[in-house]
């Protein structure tokens, strides 16, 4: 969005203008009787806007059974490999025709790199982390960060929990993925939340986005589309995921938007999202409040973490003046 402000990219630009290889993506058209996938060219070009809104067609294998099946048939590495090969999987639908949460924002990262001429981590350090004082954020851990790293834990079907001692993302990723892969602290991420609450300005006064850009990022840009439930296609990574089931939700240029007041007290128009290891945050510009619940537990939508997060949020709203 900083590049949009600067006039260096347009939201309706074809993404291939900046990342030519995205034009090679194909659409999954089903599987034959032997289970072999069939693909076809997309009916239109992918735009920058569609990537930001998760309507370009990219998915995540742990949220889509057909994409997981395709990856198994074609030996496509998981996105956690932070590889270009994982990003070149297949589209789940024609661009602009449906909402599908996936590696769309990873491709946004490639657009940013192409325009800035730098790796995404360097751009984020210069233009987000340093101005906001986020000294514990990055795609690789400093010695200080490593000394304080919380271990990933796995929840068993019986409810027990054990540390995953060998679970660590590569410290030299082939790709800096725009949609995942950062290390950070809750304190650092709350500086980002405060920036959004402060209309683009950090707590020390550094402006990273214009207030009108924050406005644009926090309103529905999906039109009549609504976001959908995310199936848990890889049980070790995610359960089925839907926030406030049955309540209409839309999407802006960064976050999910609840279109009605949530049971916690979060008002219509507030934004929120989550990360796979059961990290959840929300931003309520109307009431000038936001929060984050953070764990290092898999699979996503943990049966204890989600209720705890919702109780936490409700307590916040119950005590607002």
Where are the language model's segments positioned?
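Short, hydrophobic/aromatic-rich segments at coil-to-beta transitions
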Residues: 264-272
